[in-house]
Swiss-Prot record:
This is Uroporphyrinogen decarboxylase. It is found in: Cytoplasm. It catalyses: uroporphyrinogen III + 4 H(+) = coproporphyrinogen III + 4 CO2. Catalyzes the decarboxylation of four acetate groups of uroporphyrinogen-III to yield coproporphyrinogen-III. Pathway: Porphyrin-containing compound metabolism; protoporphyrin-IX biosynthesis; coproporphyrinogen-III from 5-aminolevulinate: step 4/4.
Length: 355
């Protein structure tokens, strides 16, 4: 495998010294880029884009051609695992992902197959291999999965939800069924992420988009314990290097200590917590990723630079910070504003890495 020309992102996640703070953006390959829209039109639809290794590679690399990013992230979707389990994933215009065969009973859960990453999900591994080859060692490649709880919300609700009544009904009326589903999903995520690592992913991330809708005790019970199981089951070294793992739960500022205690290397932060507060609480255990409000990218360039400086100052000196947005970049953000953001991180962070 190629040696890395820029390993800042991996070093920061392992809390090792870097020259400047590394930066990437969640959803950095996406609809805010005109070249992405053109490639997606060529593919026909979103899942066809995900399933074509050459096109998935192309959209993964597009933001790296525009911006001085310190990592690439696999272009895929968090719902690949439930799709491979046969739930009939489809996308409705303006409504997001839906499943034609949602989970409604214990029998549905017992009958779920365990997808083989090199069979039903081989298209993802082919994309990882293609991207890794085409990156030519410029920056590391991040692989990812949804968390068991977040995957289960889509599988039981049948798509996106605001109230999560169906999954919470199962959680509180038939917890045994939900725990069986979450356990099966954790096993599948472990297989899936380890296959991505084998295929060339140099770091992995678990996105727990909907963990924040749970009470503190239910978060531990239905979300965090399964992410802990995943962390324990991951390949943590490959090709002579450590493979860092980052956990990201949206709206989880109150649970940082518990997340850090899983043994992960990095914790993703959304914008609802101050990074200095997060560092004071868990900075001696994990790296922190984040955490500018993605909507700040609508602001004037000077305002974006001010916000970057504020977050850098909040984290302060020393390693262990990967700069990112607090969630995915919005689809109508001007690409030039994203460039202001990325360049500002490198420009203003060097002063914090002189030691």
């Amino acid at each position: 495998m190629n040696s890395l020309k820029n390993d800042r992102y991996l070093r920061a996640l392992l809390r090792q010294p870097v020259d400047v703070t590394p930066v990437w953006m969640m959803r950095q390959a996406g609809r805010y880029l005109p070249e992405y829209k053109a490639t997606r039109a060529q593919a026909g639809d979103f899942m066809s884009l995900c399933k074509n290794a050459e096109l998935a590679c192309e959209v993964t690399l597009q933001p790296l051609r525009r911006f001085d990013l310190d990592a690439a992230i696999l272009f895929s979707d968090i719902l690949t695992i439930p799709d491979a389990m046969g739930l009939g994933l489809y996308f409705e215009q303006g409504e997001g992902p839906k499943f034609s065969k949602p989970i409604t009973s214990m029998a549905d859960i017992q009958n779920l197959p365990a997808p083989d990453p090199e069979q039903e999900l081989q298209y993802v591994m082919n994309a990882v291999r293609t991207i890794r080859k085409n990156l030519q060692g410029e920056v590391p490649l991040i692989g990812f999965s949804g968390s068991p709880w977040t995957l289960a919300t889509y599988m039981i609700e049948g798509g996106s939800s605001k109230a999560f009544t169906k999954i919470k009904k199962m959680a509180f009326s038939d917890p045994q069924a939900l725990h069986l589903l979450l356990d099966k999903l954790a096993d599948s995520v472990i297989l899936y992420l380890n296959a991505q690592i084998d295929a060339g992913a140099q770091s992995v991330m678990v996105f727990d988009t909907w963990g924040g809708v749970l009470s503190p005790r239910d978060y531990q019970d239905f979300s965090l314990q399964y992410m802990h199981k995943i962390v324990d089951g991951l390949t943590r070294e490959n090709d002579g290097r450590k493979v860092p793992v980052t956990l990201f739960t949206k709206n989880a500022g109150m649970w940082l200590e518990s997340i850090a205690a899983t043994g992960c290397d990095g914790v993703g932060l959304d914008w609802t917590i101050d990074i200095d507060n997060a560092k004071a609480r868990v900075g001696d255990k994990v790296a922190l990723q984040g955490n500018m409000d993605p909507s700040m990218l609508y602001a004037a360039p000077e305002r974006i630079e001010q916000e970057v400086q504020k977050i850098l100052a909040g984290f302060g000196e020393g390693p262990g910070h990967v700069f990112n947005l607090g969630h995915g970049i919005h689809l109508d953000v001007p690409p030039e504003n994203a460039k202001v953001f990325v360049d500002a991180v490198h420009k203003y962070s060097a002063q914090y890495h002189k030691g």
